[in-house]
Protein backbone atom coordinates (compact mmCIF):
# COMPACT_ATOMS: atom_id res chain seq x y z
CA UNK A 1 0.00 0.00 0.00
CA UNK A 2 2.86 2.41 -0.72
CA UNK A 3 1.46 5.89 -1.24
CA UNK A 4 2.81 9.28 -2.22
CA UNK A 5 3.21 12.03 0.32
CA UNK A 6 3.58 15.33 -1.46
CA UNK A 7 5.58 18.10 0.19
CA UNK A 8 5.54 21.74 -0.88
CA UNK A 9 7.85 24.71 -0.69
CA UNK A 10 8.08 28.19 -2.16
CA UNK A 11 10.88 30.77 -2.50
CA UNK A 12 10.98 34.51 -2.01
CA UNK A 13 14.05 35.47 -4.06
CA UNK A 14 16.30 38.22 -2.75
CA UNK A 15 15.05 38.22 0.83
CA UNK A 16 17.39 35.62 2.33
CA UNK A 17 19.07 38.45 4.30
CA UNK A 18 15.98 38.75 6.53
CA UNK A 19 16.94 35.60 8.45
CA UNK A 20 20.36 34.29 9.46
CA UNK A 21 19.19 30.74 10.25
CA UNK A 22 16.23 28.41 9.77
CA UNK A 23 13.19 29.31 11.85
CA UNK A 24 10.21 27.08 12.65
CA UNK A 25 6.90 28.69 13.51
CA UNK A 26 5.43 25.69 15.32
CA UNK A 27 2.19 27.45 16.25
CA UNK A 28 1.47 28.01 12.55
CA UNK A 29 2.98 24.73 11.30
CA UNK A 30 5.63 25.98 8.89
CA UNK A 31 9.29 26.95 8.64
CA UNK A 32 11.50 29.39 6.75
CA UNK A 33 15.13 28.81 5.76
CA UNK A 34 17.48 31.34 4.14
CA UNK A 35 19.03 29.79 1.02
CA UNK A 36 20.88 30.93 -2.11
CA UNK A 37 17.57 30.78 -4.01
CA UNK A 38 15.95 33.08 -1.44
CA UNK A 39 13.82 32.38 1.60
CA UNK A 40 12.45 28.84 1.38
CA UNK A 41 9.08 28.40 3.06
CA UNK A 42 8.01 24.83 3.88
CA UNK A 43 5.35 23.19 5.97
CA UNK A 44 2.59 21.38 4.18
CA UNK A 45 2.16 17.81 2.99
CA UNK A 46 -0.69 15.78 1.57
CA UNK A 47 -1.51 12.42 0.07
CA UNK A 48 -2.18 13.35 -3.52
CA UNK A 49 -0.67 10.73 -5.80
CA UNK A 50 1.86 11.27 -8.54
CA UNK A 51 -0.39 12.74 -11.22
CA UNK A 52 -2.61 15.28 -9.45
CA UNK A 53 -1.66 18.92 -10.01
CA UNK A 54 -0.04 21.10 -7.40
CA UNK A 55 -2.54 22.39 -4.81
CA UNK A 56 -2.83 26.16 -5.10
CA UNK A 57 -4.55 26.32 -1.69
CA UNK A 58 -1.48 24.76 -0.03
CA UNK A 59 0.79 27.25 -1.81
CA UNK A 60 -1.49 30.10 -0.72
CA UNK A 61 -1.29 28.86 2.88
CA UNK A 62 2.53 28.96 2.77
CA UNK A 63 2.48 32.46 1.23
CA UNK A 64 0.01 33.78 3.81
CA UNK A 65 1.98 32.32 6.72
CA UNK A 66 5.28 33.75 5.46
CA UNK A 67 3.82 37.20 4.85
CA UNK A 68 2.13 37.19 8.26
CA UNK A 69 5.46 36.50 10.00
CA UNK A 70 7.71 38.62 7.73
CA UNK A 71 5.91 41.79 6.77
CA UNK A 72 6.75 43.25 3.37
CA UNK A 73 7.52 40.11 1.42
CA UNK A 74 6.73 40.40 -2.30
CA UNK A 75 5.10 37.70 -4.38
CA UNK A 76 6.95 34.40 -4.27
CA UNK A 77 8.86 33.44 -7.39
CA UNK A 78 9.06 29.66 -7.19
CA UNK A 79 6.69 26.81 -6.31
CA UNK A 80 7.86 23.24 -5.76
CA UNK A 81 6.17 19.92 -5.14
CA UNK A 82 8.15 16.80 -4.22
CA UNK A 83 7.15 13.19 -3.71
CA UNK A 84 8.02 10.97 -0.76
CA UNK A 85 7.24 7.26 -0.45
CA UNK A 86 4.88 6.79 2.50
CA UNK A 87 2.89 3.96 4.03
CA UNK A 88 -0.57 4.34 5.59
CA UNK A 89 0.70 3.78 9.16
CA UNK A 90 3.64 6.22 8.67
CA UNK A 91 6.16 3.51 9.61
CA UNK A 92 8.83 2.48 7.11
CA UNK A 93 9.37 -1.05 5.90
CA UNK A 94 12.66 -2.36 7.29
CA UNK A 95 13.57 -6.01 6.93
CA UNK A 96 14.16 -8.89 4.63
CA UNK A 97 11.99 -10.26 1.85
CA UNK A 98 9.90 -13.29 2.64
CA UNK A 99 10.63 -14.66 -0.85
CA UNK A 100 14.36 -13.95 -1.26
CA UNK A 101 16.94 -14.37 1.52
CA UNK A 102 19.35 -11.89 -0.05
CA UNK A 103 16.81 -9.05 -0.56
CA UNK A 104 16.36 -6.48 2.20
CA UNK A 105 13.91 -3.58 2.33
CA UNK A 106 14.29 -0.08 3.69
CA UNK A 107 11.70 2.33 2.28
CA UNK A 108 8.63 4.38 3.09
CA UNK A 109 10.24 6.84 5.52
CA UNK A 110 7.95 9.64 4.17
CA UNK A 111 9.40 13.10 4.82
CA UNK A 112 11.93 11.70 7.31
CA UNK A 113 13.97 9.80 4.73
CA UNK A 114 17.15 11.84 5.22
CA UNK A 115 16.72 11.71 8.99
CA UNK A 116 16.05 7.98 9.30
CA UNK A 117 17.98 6.68 6.28
CA UNK A 118 21.30 6.25 8.10
CA UNK A 119 19.67 4.50 11.06
CA UNK A 120 17.73 2.16 8.77
CA UNK A 121 20.89 1.50 6.77
CA UNK A 122 22.73 0.49 9.92
CA UNK A 123 19.92 -1.88 10.88
CA UNK A 124 19.92 -3.43 7.39
CA UNK A 125 23.71 -3.83 7.46
CA UNK A 126 23.44 -5.71 10.76
CA UNK A 127 20.72 -7.93 9.32
CA UNK A 128 22.85 -8.72 6.26
CA UNK A 129 25.79 -9.57 8.56
CA UNK A 130 23.53 -11.72 10.79
CA UNK A 131 24.24 -9.47 13.77
CA UNK A 132 21.68 -8.87 16.52
CA UNK A 133 20.00 -5.48 16.46
CA UNK A 134 18.34 -5.63 19.91
CA UNK A 135 15.31 -4.04 18.26
CA UNK A 136 11.83 -5.38 17.71
CA UNK A 137 11.54 -4.98 13.94
CA UNK A 138 8.11 -6.62 13.71
CA UNK A 139 6.29 -3.26 13.48
CA UNK A 140 8.39 -2.48 10.37
CA UNK A 141 7.80 -5.77 8.58
CA UNK A 142 6.52 -5.70 5.01
CA UNK A 143 4.14 -8.49 6.04
CA UNK A 144 2.09 -6.18 8.28
CA UNK A 145 -0.08 -5.30 5.29
CA UNK A 146 -0.92 -8.87 4.23
Each predicted region: which residue ranges?
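Active-site substrate-recognition segment that forms the wall
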Residues: 1-101
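C-terminal lid/capping helical subdomain adjacent to the catalytic/cofactor pocket in oxidative enzymes
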Residues: 13, 93, 98-146
Amino acid sequence: PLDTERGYHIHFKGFEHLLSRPVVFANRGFGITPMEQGLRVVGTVEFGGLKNPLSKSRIKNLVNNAKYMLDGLPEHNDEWLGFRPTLPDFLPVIGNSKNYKNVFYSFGHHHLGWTLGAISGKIISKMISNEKTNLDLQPYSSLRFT
